[in-house]
């Protein structure tokens, strides 16, 4: 079920403050975050976030198409190496 419209999008307050500070100062350094659950807002466009995937920080550059999605959607947590090839099928 989707989040109710009257509540608005969820963004961790500390992340919102860091993003606003980076926009005001014009800093190009990536913002390090563990908050995969935060929604990407229009004011995040152009910023780079280092999102933790459980093992390392994955750089995520925010573009217009990402607005409304969660930060965690762009930092995969699982690695799929592919299915093994069959020995008889070459």
Curated annotation (Swiss-Prot):
One of its GO terms (molecular function) is structural constituent of ribosome. SUPFAM superfamilies: Ribosomal protein S19. It holds the Pfam family Ribosomal_S19. Keywords: Ribonucleoprotein, Ribosomal protein, RNA-binding, rRNA-binding. It comes from the Bacteria. Transmembrane segments: none annotated. GO terms for biological process: ribosomal small subunit assembly; translation. The keyword Kinase does not apply. One of its GO terms (cellular component) is small ribosomal subunit. Protein S19 forms a complex with S13 that binds strongly to the 16S ribosomal RNA. HAMAP family: Ribosomal_uS19 (MF_00531). Belongs to the universal ribosomal protein uS19 family. This is Small ribosomal subunit protein uS19. It comes from Rhizorhabdus wittichii (strain DSM 6014 / CCUG 31198 / JCM 15750 / NBRC 105917 / EY 4224 / RW1) (Sphingomonas wittichii). The gene is rpsS.
């Amino acid at each position: 079920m989707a989040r109710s419209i009257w509540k608005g999008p969820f963004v961790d307050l500390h992340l919102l403050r860091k993003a606003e500070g980076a926009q005001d100062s014009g800093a190009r350094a990536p913002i390090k975050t563990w908050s995969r659950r935060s929604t990407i807002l229009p004011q995040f466009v152009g910023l780079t976030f280092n999102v933790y995937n459980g093992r390392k920080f994955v750089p995520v550059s925010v573009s217009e198409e990402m607005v409304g999605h969660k930060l965690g959607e762009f930092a995969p947590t699982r690695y799929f190496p592919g299915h093994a090839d069959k020995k008889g099928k070459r």
